[in-house]
Regions:
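Subtilisin-like serine protease catalytic core
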Residues: 36-75, 80-130, 144-147, 160, ...
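Active-site-adjacent substrate-recognition loops and nearby beta-strands
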Residues: 131-134, 158-159, 164-166, 178, ...
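Active-site glycine-centered loops adjacent to acidic/histidine catalytic or metal-binding residues
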Residues: 54, 181, 196
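Autoinhibitory propeptides
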Residues: 1-29, 36-39, 213
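Short acidic, glycine-rich surface-loop motifs adjacent to enzyme active sites
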Residues: 115, 139-171, 194-195
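Catalytic-core regions built around general acid/base machinery
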Residues: 172-188
Length: 237
């Protein structure tokens, strides 16, 4: 797992405007994925419930571009007593791509959806138990009627090297979270997960749960539509 941490407080303290575009800082990405065309057709996430399963959501409750009224609830599966808004910011960055809604600053792909913000990633260690946390978060999402799960997590190395995965284990059945992910569609939900950020390192391959059956594994491209060098290699949607 590798997480790219943005400048944590930039949207809180310095919300930069981009008057040349309604979508602000998100203009290039939403146009590349044709999300703007969906918006023009009236599809802005309304009536959908999305669960984000990730690391923390640092300062998301202070960023006014987020509509906290659209947050149905939060739950921390790593430390139930922790404040997910005081933890790592990767989940906040992921959510922002969908949920931000401030014209000329940034408008995400689903600004009118409802959200559950769930934390399963322990930023201070890398252990197999985090896949148990993730699996519990998936079951919780099912219990509260979620339509779509978005998760940008993946695992292949651990603090105990004897637990590290091997290429032959990328079969959608070996890793616990891959087995769990394969059942999500059976419950009527869509799971969208990142391919991984290991493309430039020695591993290179996609990371579980991206190898699961019946999920949408999404890669990464730059503004020019060319695959990014960090993108993990393997099957996507």
């Amino acid at each position: 797992k590798e997480v790219v941490t943005p400048q944590r407080d930039s949207l809180v303290n310095r919300p930069e405007k981009h008057p040349e575009s309604y979508y602000g800082a998100g203009a290039a990405q939403i146009q590349l994925s044709r999300g703007d065309k969906l918006h023009e057709a009236g599809f802005r996430g309304q009536g959908m419930t999305i669960a984000v399963i990730d690391a923390g959501y640092h300062n998301a409750d202070r960023i006014t571009a987020f509509d906290m009224n659209r947050v149905l609830g939060v739950k921390d599966f790593v430390n139930p007593r922790a404040d997910i808004f005081a933890e790592q910011s990767h989940g906040m960055a992921v959510w922002s791509c969908m949920g931000l809604n401030r014209p000329e600053v940034m408008v995400g792909t689903a600004p009118e959806a409802s959200y559950w913000l769930l934390r399963s990633e322990d930023d201070y260690s890398e252990n197999l138990v985090e896949q148990d946390y993730w699996s519990a978060a998936v079951e919780f999402a099912d219990s509260v009627g979620v339509d779509v799960i978005n998760t940008s997590l993946g695992y292949y190395t651990f603090d105990d090297p004897s637990k590290n995965y091997e290429f032959r284990q990328l079969d959608g059945r070996y890793a616990l979270m891959s087995r769990q992910a394969s059942h999500v569609a059976d419950k009527g939900m869509v799971l969208v997960c990142s391919a991984g950020n290991a493309g430039a390192g020695p591993w290179k391959k996609i990371t579980p749960p991206a190898d699961a059956d019946n999920v949408l594994t999404v890669g990464a491209v730059g503004k020019d539509g060319v695959l990014d060098t960090f993108l993990s290699i393997g099957n996507t949607a």
